[in-house]
């Protein structure tokens, strides 16, 4: 799908009027030809489909093409963890000082769906594990970090600040040359929180990037980058930044007493802080429990903007899904569901009967996602006329508990402790309900994907689940759960049991069929969120920034998608 002729005409007109402005105001040696909108640089440790472990990768994969469709010039910068076959060496090298060493990084690039995808090449990223990195982005196993993560992410931020100035990119029909200095950086989560610090200490004070701004997006407050206070020296920042990092908590890890907190510094030093749903804003600023001890910093900043994520409506579309046997839309969902359910039941070894309601859980097996709550609550409902299928990987203890669930209830339950994309698609096509018992959920993607397939969510009332699932209209809410990870709260177990029973009573009723239709009638794409992101970034007032236009995203297989040496 390409920009319409009307939109191309608008872009051409704006390019003609803006060229002189950019030519005169640019501080780089190469000319910049821009059409409209803003130059936006997303910096993150994950970007789908190249590398991801969760929702961060989906956002950095899906939001930039939607902004590019509006006429903005968009780049993403992420580490090159593996030898991605669709990216090419730009032969552009820069030197950065990391810790007590000078490191040379190289940039790889491809142009996909209107976005410049840039990857930072260095042994710190490419040579951390034996063989393919895959999902081992932060450590060799779940819950274990690489010891040099601070240096790795310093390297990423320093390289990201060089990329807009040194990369001469010319794949776009409407833009050419380096991005220049009048840009908006979007730093994501604690891994990129030092970017605004380096921008101020190394560039702005030397007259570079004088008009650049930084938006800092919190995808998950639970991961903050807390390290021993002595590690501040590794960052090569002036002592004046120490108050932004300084942090005291009551925990003994990584050390007792004063620490540095990367996320605190990112919040303090950025120009605006955002997060991924309006309700998550309320939770983060409500107190230390849900704000994970950064609530005061967020109220001071303040954190006011939460924008619900969109989803990939190309990969996750029941009308075109290559992984499901019977494709369908809102008109044919009932008939197709019955057939897809029987195929799913046969695939996982359950009794084949389309009249039995099927509940699925798809996600990481960890405390945040509440998989331990679900396993504890399963006896409350699993012996009824229902089947439950759980798909996910994570902590070994929870994977073992999942296997025991299948052993205990062989007629009703199946647990698949592995990463299986085709099966996930089959589960959406064949299930009636998706259960999401998260202790906290900043936005959540799984409920959006489920609703697009007409699967009704049964979810806890937290974060983005509150904003995206409407009680009695598109799903069932179970209330908020205890956020403590150490134990499973019996109250939460009872809530799961009673609300699953409540949902099952509606199965195959007119109310249930209406909920399925309501789920599928929603626009869950990135188009709406992209407009809100545009508004938030325009408010930063970067010189030359303009609103975009109404355009269509470039399709994944369109001829504009190129990787050139």
Curated annotation (Swiss-Prot):
Cellular component GO terms, alphabetical: amyloplast; chloroplast
Main location (coarse class): plastid
Classification via CDD domains: GT5_Glycogen_synthase_DULL1-like
Domain of life of the organism encoding this protein: Eukaryota
Name of a matching Pfam family: Glyco_transf_5
Protein name: Granule-bound starch synthase 1b, chloroplastic/amyloplastic
GO MF annotation, one: alpha-1,4-glucan glucosyltransferase (UDP-glucose donor) activity
Pathway per the UniProt entry: Glycan biosynthesis; starch biosynthesis
The protein's role, per its UniProt record: Involved in the synthesis of amylose in endosperm.
EC number: 2.4.1.242
Subcellular location: Plastid, Chloroplast; Plastid, Amyloplast
SUPFAM superfamilies: UDP-Glycosyltransferase/glycogen phosphorylase
Annotated source species: Hordeum vulgare
Catalyzed reactions per annotation: an NDP-alpha-D-glucose + [(1->4)-alpha-D-glucosyl](n) = [(1->4)-alpha-D-glucosyl](n+1) + a ribonucleoside 5'-diphosphate + H(+)
Binding site for ADP-alpha-D-glucose: 52
Family as reported in the entry's similarity comment: Belongs to the glycosyltransferase 1 family. Bacterial/plant glycogen synthase subfamily.
Keyword Transferase: yes
GO biological process terms, semicolon-separated: starch biosynthetic process
NCBIfam families, per database record: glgA (TIGR02095)
Transit peptide: 1-34
Cysteines engaged in disulfide bonds, as pairs: none
Keywords of this entry: Amyloplast, Chloroplast, Glycosyltransferase, Plastid, Starch biosynthesis, Transferase, Transit peptide
InterPro entries recorded: Glyco_trans_1 (IPR001296), GS/SS (IPR011835), Starch_synth_cat_dom (IPR013534)
């Amino acid at each position: 799908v390409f920009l319409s002729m009307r939109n191309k005409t608008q872009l051409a007109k704006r390019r003609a009027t803006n060229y002189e402005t950019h030519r005169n105001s640019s501080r780089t040696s190469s000319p910049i030809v821009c059409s409209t909108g803003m130059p936006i640089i997303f910096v993150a440790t994950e970007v789908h489909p190249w590398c991801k472990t969760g929702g961060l990768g989906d956002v950095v994969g899906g939001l930039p093409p939607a902004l590019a469709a509006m006429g903005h010039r968009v780049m993403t910068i992420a580490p090159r963890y593996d030898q991605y076959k669709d990216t090419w060496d730009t032969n552009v090298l820069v030197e950065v000082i990391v810790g007590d060493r000078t490191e040379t990084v190289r940039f790889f690039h491809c142009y996909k769906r209107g976005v410049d995808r840039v990857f930072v090449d260095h042994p710190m990223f490419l040579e951390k594990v034996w063989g393919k990195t895959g999902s081992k982005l932060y450590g060799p196993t779940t819950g274990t970090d690489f010891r040099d993560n601070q240096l790795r992410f310093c390297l990423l931020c320093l390289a990201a600040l060089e990329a807009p100035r040194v990369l001469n990119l010319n794949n776009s029909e409407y833009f050419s040359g380096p991005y220049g200095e009048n840009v908006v950086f979007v730093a994501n989560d604690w891994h990129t929180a030092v970017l605004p610090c380096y921008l101020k200490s190394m560039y702005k004070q030397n007259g570079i990037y004088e008009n650049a701004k930084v938006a800092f997006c919190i995808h998950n407050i639970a991961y903050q980058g807390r390290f021993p206070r002595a590690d501040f020296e590794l960052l090569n920042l002036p002592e004046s930044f120490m108050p932004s990092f300084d942090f005291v908590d009551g925990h003994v890890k990584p050390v007792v007493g004063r620490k540095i907190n990367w996320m605190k510094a990112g919040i303090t030093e950025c120009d605006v802080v955002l997060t991924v749903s309006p309700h998550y804003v309320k939770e983060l600023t409500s107190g230390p429990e849900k704000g994970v001890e950064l609530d005061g910093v967020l109220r001071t900043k303040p954190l006011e903007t939460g924008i619900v994520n969109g989803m990939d409506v190309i990969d996750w579309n029941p009308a075109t899904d290559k992984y499901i046997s019977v494709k369908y839309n809102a008109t044919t969902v009932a008939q197709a569901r019955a057939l897809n359910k029987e195929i799913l039941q046969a695939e996982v070894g359950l009794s084949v009967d389309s009249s039995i309601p099927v509940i699925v859980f798809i996600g990481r097996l960890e405390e945040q996602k509440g998989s331990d709550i679900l396993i504890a609550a399963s006896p409350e409902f699993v012996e009824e006329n229902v089947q439950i299928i759980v798909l996910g990987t994570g902590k070994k203890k929870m994977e073992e508990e999942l296997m025991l669930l299948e052993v205990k209830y062989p007629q009703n339950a199946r647990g698949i402790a592995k990463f299986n994309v085709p099966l996930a698609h089959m589960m959406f096509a064949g299930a009636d309900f998706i259960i999401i018992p998260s202790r906290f959920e900043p936005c959540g993607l799984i409920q959006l994907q489920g609703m697009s397939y007409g699967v009704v969510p049964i979810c806890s009332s937290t974060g983005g689940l509150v904003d995206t699932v409407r009680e009695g209209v598109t799903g069932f809410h179970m209330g908020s759960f205890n956020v403590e990870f150490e134990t499973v709260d019996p109250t939460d177990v009872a809530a799961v049991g009673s609300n699953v029973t409540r949902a099952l009573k509606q199965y195959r009723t007119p109310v249930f069929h209406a909920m399925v239709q309501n789920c599928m009638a929603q626009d869950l794409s990135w188009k709406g969120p992209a407009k809100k992101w545009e508004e938030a970034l325009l408010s930063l007032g970067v010189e030359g920034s303009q609103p975009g236009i109404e355009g269509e995203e470039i399709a994944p297989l369109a001829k504009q998608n190129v990787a050139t040496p």
